[in-house]
Every structure is written in C-alpha cells, then in structure tokens.
Amino acid sequence: MSYTIPAQTRTEIGKGSSRRLRREGKVPAVIYGVGKEPVSIVFDHKDIINIQANDDFYTSVLTIVLDGKEVNVRAQAMQRHVFKPMIDHVDFVYA
C-alpha cells in the first residue's frame, strides 16, 4: 500500500519552535540520506496518526509531497509522547 503525506519545509529549527508546532497539532520531522542535504519538514498530526498504525508503514516507501514536489522516503525512527497518543518527531530516509 502506498501512503502520501503532504508536508511543508520548516524554517524555524529548535526546541521552542518544535514545541509551538506540536501545540498547533503539527509534527516536526527531518528527511536525510547519503549524499543529500537534510531537510526539516512539518506536517499535520492527523495526516500520520492513522496511517502509522499499519505495519507496512514502517517497511514501505512513502511519498511526501513537499511544497508541491514528491519525495520518496522510508520511516527511519519515530518518537512518541510518553502517555498521550501523539507523535513527537519522525525521521525519514530518502528511498
């Protein structure tokens, strides 16, 4: 199954800006890989919370629509809130 996640490039980086994004219902993330510059992104929490419950989310290639351009990635790591059903941060790797 293929998954598509709309995202935007993130310009503000750091703990304070990430906390502000989480309060707004967004998830900060990063895309990195060999030979490419890392890209900080942000997407809506509602766009990922349901699809990450599927097992194939972690093994299949995902499509992130980043500012109108499609980028193929794989989920590398996901940080979750300790007791709330929320995702704090996601690391993606270029596929």
From Swiss-Prot:
GO terms for molecular function: 5S rRNA binding; structural constituent of ribosome. One of its GO terms (cellular component) is cytosolic large ribosomal subunit. One of its GO terms (biological process) is translation. The keyword rRNA-binding applies. InterPro entries: Rbsml_bL25/Gln-tRNA_synth_N (IPR020056), Ribosomal_bL25/Gln-tRNA_synth (IPR011035), Ribosomal_bL25_long (IPR001021), Ribosomal_bL25_short (IPR020055), Ribosomal_L25_dom (IPR029751), Ribosomal_uL5_bac-type (IPR020930). Keywords: Ribonucleoprotein, Ribosomal protein, RNA-binding, rRNA-binding. Coiled coil: none annotated. The keyword Transcription regulation does not apply. This is one of the proteins that binds to the 5S RNA in the ribosome where it forms part of the central protuberance. Belongs to the bacterial ribosomal protein bL25 family. NCBIfam families: bL25_bact_ctc (TIGR00731), PRK05943.1 (NF004612). Part of the 50S ribosomal subunit; part of the 5S rRNA/L5/L18/L25 subcomplex. Contacts the 5S rRNA. Binds to the 5S rRNA independently of L5 and L18. This is Large ribosomal subunit protein bL25. The gene is rplY.
